[in-house]
């Protein structure tokens, strides 16, 4: 494959959709500049092939000057979809984020027609288009919107209709939709991971034309477990034979994959394309079917191109589980759309940075292609497997005691809205067609002059209607009192039938309708006698309407041989309390849905069994009653059935500590095994539950549920110490290098040096958690991180964002970071990466190899202070859901405007830097110390804090031979700080801060003493 990325950006730096016509001569593109670009595709492909063979300056100049041959301007917002009609060279559809859909025909002067919104609904709400597709016969256009609905547009009959009205579920955004190549199915993928499969067909109507009919046949909800919602687009694709559907951004057990659903295998997942770690948002099948050998139809395969937000393009062969070609970091920005030329030899894709890329394949590089006749035969083979529209699928069969199947629900074009007629005619025709669907044909030889209100949208709201005062009918009806009863009964019958319709209608003057000849089996209703029918060998008594029990029979003939009872149970006279909220509201709603919506069913099981999950935990830690009333009570980890730890001193990950818990007694002890790959090195058996484990530089340590610590040699498994008994279950077990740290559930803190086998410190974390409160025992902040450094210094972070270290010399906890610094310091890094400019890396989410384990937290490239400040950022964002901007806004509004608070931010910034420097001294962070110290001195020089500068310089200078005024305890002065020579730091400060005029007098004074400045006098 030869790959070319055009050097310049198009559409104001964002191309969101591209497509190619049938003869590969035109490429259309749309993006952020609200324009549609029309490209000469032949010239584009020829130029891309020329670059790969003759990369001359003339060719590169042609590339830089390459532009669309013309632009079409009709949209007023971002264009997110452009699609050519199948097999067409001139006509295509475009849509934008404002919900507009346009029809285009390419000529010298392109013709454009707005399909949606049309006049009769332009006053209603129009929602942004999410995705759009065109049927294989170029008759139907379907698009989804961000309110969870899918709409159909018939370009032949100019009708418009909502498809999702037959789903009867809470609207969920359908992120991608696609018609199949065989013109039988429409598939949609929602943000709730559910895939809806619609089947449709055409049937002749009374006007010798055909109308479509849709039906929801499958709901696939167990294909994948997660669905990333942060993707801008998700574009699914059908295989050219109509058998496979590729679903991107699927996730199963934290693994990103592309799922292939097979239509011939009853819509099951037959293949998952895995084998790489990057995300995939857009997929596109090659329009050709390939084989490994020429004209060999026994082993065929398709080719898929996939791309997404990770800037990676992959080419897949459906017969293989791994990609055949991967272009990593090929472009800058997300890959938003992919298209193939119709001959399958060129691949084009666009990015969010406005780049257009082309990949050209050599003949037979992807495989041997088949002729058009063979391709049609493949499609016909799939069409032979299509079930009729009235077919009952297995999940729709009767289960248990259900004797009668519910009716199949169809969406008929008879109920669609015409886009060419006026609003009143549209509603009138809609009402007439709706009445035909329920089997009622209202006839009259005269017209009724009834005045009603036009309803253009929304749901009909029931209201109390007073007894109608009917106007006299024209001709053919007598004016006696019996006719009044006849008219009243007719109106009631009409109202009851109208209420069964889903779309609002307007009662206009009905035109005279020719008499309809009913079937020989047509029976007229008698309102004075209940009707008895026989169905499936059982007598059915039709209920009689009370309001029409004494009315005269209607003259209106019925078109159905058996009149169905009026079923209108959506409104009830009783009200019920909602079920207990211990049951999910979504559960009992879905439990009441009709059987036709169930996606799974069984003829054998009357009651669905809950799927069994593997046992992850085998119990909880039992606390001693004496310690359960402690002032500090920390949570303890649950006891796991088994777990493994990979050795962090081994880069290959072949050494593993495997722990399998038994029954917690002598009859079945827990097993502790250290292995190299599958080979056992050493093992031990413990008659207790093992709770936690950690690894040091030369030891392994495990804890049991009763608070006992066992230590082993790293290599041989020899016991290093007798069992350490703490008496309380352990909440945190951490280690780094030669240090082992333990925090019990009652807040006791221990740190041991395992080389010399001595206790380094014993303290408690209660000062961090015991906050004063009048109400006594309250819930305090959670511990979010507990670790130990290479110097044996404990570190703790809390859920309020504060981070602490324990000073062994002072015997107290000291603050490293808190949210106050984020509140007003200029030097706070509020980014979420954990890496500030010029500093070491924290435990950011961008590096998958880093974890919050102590062993991997404090390596040479990482900064402890930046890590803890990153934890503060996480807690602030988690609690407030806002960034630093909101805090800064609070300062500017509430404090900076007040008298006496003008220097608030400068003061906070200086305090923040001073705290950083002091913590670096305690933690031994040499690299961070130099960076923070240099920044601090420059800042106090800039602000003119001469006293602070003098004190800093005096400390760095120390005692000198000529200075006899120093106090006698000056001999305690250390010449180095954090590995840096103090006087060298002083020289660096004098030279770097000399440009600040307010500090020059102080700097010159110390410069003379250290010999940097020569006194000419």
Swiss-Prot record:
InterPro entries given in the database record: HIR1-like, HIRA-like_C, HIRA_B_motif, WD40/YVTN_repeat-like_dom_sf, WD40_repeat_CS, WD40_repeat_dom_sf, WD40_rpt
Biological process per Gene Ontology, one example term: positive regulation of filamentous growth
GO cellular component: chromatin; HIR complex; nucleus
Pfam families noted in UniProt: Hira, HIRA_B, WD40
PROSITE patterns linked: WD_REPEATS_1 (PS00678), WD_REPEATS_2 (PS50082), WD_REPEATS_REGION (PS50294)
Keyword hit for Repressor: yes
WD repeat placement: 10-49, 74-117, 124-163, 167-208, 228-271, 275-326, 330-371
Skewed-composition ranges (Polar residues): 518-535, 545-561
SUPFAM superfamilies: WD40 repeat-like
Disordered, as annotated region: 417-561
Residue spans of biased composition, Acidic residues class: 473-483
Protein keywords: Chromatin regulator, Nucleus, Repeat, Repressor, Transcription, Transcription regulation, WD repeat
Major subcellular site: nucleus
Subcellular locations according to the entry: Nucleus
Described purpose of this protein according to its UniProt entry: Required for replication-independent chromatin assembly and for the periodic repression of histone gene transcription during the cell cycle.
Family: Belongs to the WD repeat HIR1 family.
UniProt-recorded name of the protein: Protein HIR2
Organism: Candida albicans (strain SC5314 / ATCC MYA-2876) (Yeast)
Gene: HIR2
């Amino acid at each position: 494959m030869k790959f070319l990325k055009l050097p310049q950006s198009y559409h104001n730096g964002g191309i969101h959709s591209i497509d190619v016509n049938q003869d590969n001569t035109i490429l259309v593109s749309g993006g952020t500049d609200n324009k549609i670009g029309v490209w000469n595709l032949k010239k584009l492909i020829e130029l891309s092939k020329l670059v790969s063979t003759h990369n001359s300056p003339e060719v590169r100049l042609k590339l830089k000057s390459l532009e669309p041959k013309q632009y079409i301007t009709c949209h007023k917002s971002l264009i997110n979809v452009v699609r050519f009609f199948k097999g067409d060279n001139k006509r295509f559809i475009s849509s934008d984020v404002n919900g507009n859909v346009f029809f285009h025909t390419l000529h010298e002067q392109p013709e454009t027609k707005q399909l949606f919104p049309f006049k009769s609904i332009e006053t209603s709400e129009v929602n942004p288009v999410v995705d759009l597709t065109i049927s294989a016969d170029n008759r139907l256009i379907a698009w989804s919107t961000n309110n969870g609905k899918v709409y159909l547009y018939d370009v032949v009959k100019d009708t418009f209709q909502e498809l999702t009205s037959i789903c009867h579920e809470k609207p969920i955004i359908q992120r991608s939709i696609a018609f199949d190549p065989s013109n039988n199915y429409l598939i949609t993928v929602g943000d709730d991971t559910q895939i809806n499969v619609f089947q449709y067909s055409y049937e002749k109507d009374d006007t010798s034309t055909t109308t479509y009919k849709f039906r929801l046949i499958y709901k696939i909800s167990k294909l994948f477990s997660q669905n990333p919602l942060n993707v801008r687009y998700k574009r699914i694709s059908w295989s050219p034979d109509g058998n496979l559907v590729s679903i991107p951004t699927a996730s199963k057990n934290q693994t990103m994959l592309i799922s292939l659903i097979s239509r011939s295998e009853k819509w099951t997942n037959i293949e998952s394309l895995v084998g790489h770690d990057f995300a995939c948002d857009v997929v596109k099948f090659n329009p050709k079917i390939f084989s490994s050998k020429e004209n060999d139809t026994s082993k065929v395969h398709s080719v898929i191109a996939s791309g997404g937000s990770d800037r990676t393009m992959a080419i897949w062969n459906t017969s293989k589980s791994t990609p055949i070609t991967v272009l990593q970091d090929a472009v800058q920005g997300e890959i938003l759309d992919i298209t193939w030329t119709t001959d399958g030899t060129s691949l084009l894709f666009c990015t969010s940075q406005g780049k257009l890329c082309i990949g050209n394949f050599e003949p037979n590089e992807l495989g041997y292609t088949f002729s058009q006749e063979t391709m049609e035969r493949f499609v016909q083979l799939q069409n032979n497997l299509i079930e009729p529209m009235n077919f009952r699928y297995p999940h729709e069969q009767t289960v248990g005691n259900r004797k009668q199947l519910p009716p199949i629900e169809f969406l008929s074009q008879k109920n669609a809205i015409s886009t060419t007629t006026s609003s009143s005619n549209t509603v009138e025709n809609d009402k007439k067609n709706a009445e035909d669907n329920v089997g009622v044909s209202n006839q009259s030889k005269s017209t009724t002059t009834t005045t009603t209100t036009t309803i253009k949208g929304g749901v009909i709201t029931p209201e109390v209607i007073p007894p109608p005062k009917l106007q006299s009918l024209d001709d053919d009806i007598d004016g006696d009192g019996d006719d009044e009863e006849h008219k009243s009964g007719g109106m009631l019958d009409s109202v009851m039938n109208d209420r069964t319709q889903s779309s609002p209608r307007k009662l206009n003057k009905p035109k005279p309708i020719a008499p309809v000849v009913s079937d020989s089996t047509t029976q007229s209703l008698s309102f004075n006698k209940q009707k008895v029918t026989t169905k499936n060998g059982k007598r059915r008594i039709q209920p009689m309407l009370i309001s029409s029990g004494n009315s005269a029979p209607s003259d209106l003939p019925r078109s159905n041989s058996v009149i169905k009872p009026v079923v209108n149970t959506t409104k009830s006279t009783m009200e019920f309390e909602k079920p207990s909220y211990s049951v999910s509201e979504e559960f009992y709603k879905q439990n009441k849905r009709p059987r036709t919506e169930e996606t799974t069913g069984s003829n054998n099981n009357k009651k669905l069994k809950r799927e069994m999950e593997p046992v992850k935990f085998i119990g909880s830690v039992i606390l001693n009653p004496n310690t359960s009333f402690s002032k500090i009570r920390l949570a303890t980890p649950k006891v796991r059935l088994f777990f493994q730890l990979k050795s962090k001193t081994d880069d290959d990950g072949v050494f593993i500590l495997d722990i399998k818990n038994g029954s917690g007694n002598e009859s079945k002890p827990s097993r502790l095994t250290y292995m190299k790959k599958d080979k056992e090195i050493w093992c031990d058996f413990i008659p207790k539950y093992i709770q936690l484990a950690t690894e040091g530089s030369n030891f392994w340590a495990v804890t049991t549920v009763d608070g006992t610590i066992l230590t082993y040699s790293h290599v041989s498994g020899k016991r290093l110490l007798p069992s350490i008994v703490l008496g309380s279950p352990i909440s945190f077990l951490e280690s780094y290098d030669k240090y082992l740290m333990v925090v019990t559930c009652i807040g006791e803190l221990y740190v041991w040096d395992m080389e010399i086998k001595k206790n380094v410190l014993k303290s408690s974390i209660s000062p961090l958690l015991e906050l004063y409160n009048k109400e006594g025992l309250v819930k305090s902040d959670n511990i979010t991180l507990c670790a130990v450094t290479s110097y044996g210094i404990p570190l703790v972070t809390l859920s309020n964002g504060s981070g602490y270290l324990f000073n062994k010399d002072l015997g107290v906890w000291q603050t490293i970071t808190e949210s106050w610094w984020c509140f007003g310091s200029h030097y706070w890094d509020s980014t979420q990466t954990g890496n500030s400019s010029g500093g070491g890396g924290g435990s950011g989410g961008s590096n998958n190899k880093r974890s919050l384990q102590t062993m991997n937290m404090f390596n040479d490239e990482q900064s402890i202070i930046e890590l803890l400040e990153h934890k503060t950022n996480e807690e602030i964002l988690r609690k407030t859901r806002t960034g630093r901007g909101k805090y800064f806004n609070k300062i500017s509004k509430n404090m900076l405007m007040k008298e006496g608070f003008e220097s608030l931010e400068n003061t906070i910034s200086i305090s923040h830097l001073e705290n950083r420097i002091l913590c670096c001294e305690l933690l031994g962070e040499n690299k961070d110390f130099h960076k923070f110290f240099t920044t601090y001195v420059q800042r106090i020089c800039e602000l003119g804090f001469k006293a602070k500068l003098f004190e800093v310089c005096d400390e760095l200078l120390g005692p000198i031979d000529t200075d006899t005024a120093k106090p006698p305890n000056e001999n305690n002065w250390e010449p180095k700080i954090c590995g840096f020579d103090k006087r060298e730091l002083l020289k660096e400060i004098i030279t770097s801060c000399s440009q600040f005029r307010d500090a020059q007098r102080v700097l010159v004074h110390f410069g003379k003493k250290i010999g940097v400045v020569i006194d000419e006098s």
